[in-house]
Amino acid sequence: MLFRSVVEFQAASLPDKLTGTVMAVPAEDGLLLSDQPGQYYKTSYKLAAELLTAVPVVAYDLKELASRFLRRNLPVKFVASYDVGHAGFLMGSLSKPRTLADILAELSDQSEPRQLATVYQLWQQTRRQLNQLPQLAQLASRVDFPLQPVLARMEERGVLADRAQLTRLHQKLGDGLALLEQAIRREVGYEFNVASPAQLSEALFTKLALKPTARKNKRGSYPTGAKELAKLRSAHPVIDLIIKYRELAKLKTGYADTLPKLIAPDGRIHTTFSQSITATGRLSSSNPNMQNIPARTEQGREIKRAFIAPAGRVLVNADYAQFELRLAAALAGDQALIRVFDDPTNDVHTMTAAEAYGITPAEVTPEQRRHAKVINFGILYGMSPHGLAEATDMNLSEAREFIDKYFQARRSIRDYQAKVIEQAKEDGYVQTLLGQIGRAHV
């Protein structure tokens, strides 16, 4: 909620040099700059690029401001000082991202002075709130705010795409889908639209008389989602064909068909990065989502191969090993788990299985290790016995017993989770190691 503006802005002549922190607000035909409350200067982006050299800048959206310079082939020389919109997100005051245009659209007066006054008062308001949370303020000033122009450069640069590879994959997936459709229809015994959930339901539960695993939906058909099909795998060979068909269809429509249309004239795909979409502040991307390119299947890996490096360069892929588990061990002070990670010869999932089943690591079977891997990652996100049973071949009783044994071996993690929940109830929010706030719903 905006409070009544206490600063009125008036246009002034542009000085030769700006001093102190500069507030920058995009205008229809230029940029509004203010280095002191009450007055502002209107200038072109070209001149602003020179005036803002090594100057701390406040903006409602630092990434968008940097992008405006980059789109005009101008250098980004300013120091990212304060991002008003992102500050609101960091403190959990924004349930969803709001652009400056969203806020200004609610105002009856949208003049340039009013736009400046709005950004100024939001800056002052959020800065006071942020300063009450020193750890979060440090995260913002050292990491999040300086990252915004970097993200703008990443978006502007984009990633090189191999159009020929995507064209080949488009054809290959289309051929594969056609063959699978024929095989599915042969198994069922008549022609129908495999992509139609209603027609597929009719084929499985009426024609083949398979036993439904769930009640009928509102449209009067038995559901044929991934969960339901997984439960039917042993009932008929057509189920595996349908699962494979859907995997290929998702790859084709979601990537092979879509990505070529997103290749810009420079031969690159330019995604949009955001720090204010996920509740945790984890970086996300959209149009397209470059962080969710599938790689578990060979066809998925073929999509990844369409992203290439320019001549003389290479793409480097790096990933943390069991990052969430390592954080959990440190946060909970689980010394046994920390010792497992300290020894690079240890396998954390094998060690967990050994502790849960009361056997030596050498006695752990591949199936027991798989169970431990599922629970190691799932338990951090509240996996229930029902969820564990669905993710493995355990029944509900076995899953419940395994979780009990897990927490006997990992009491510190159970105690830490309980402590966090109680703290969230008391404070109304949870906080990460670096101070990121998440409003609690408990």
Question: PLM features: residue spans?
Answer:
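Helical catalytic core of nucleic-acid polymerases
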Residues: 65-134, 144-157, 197-198, 216-218, ...
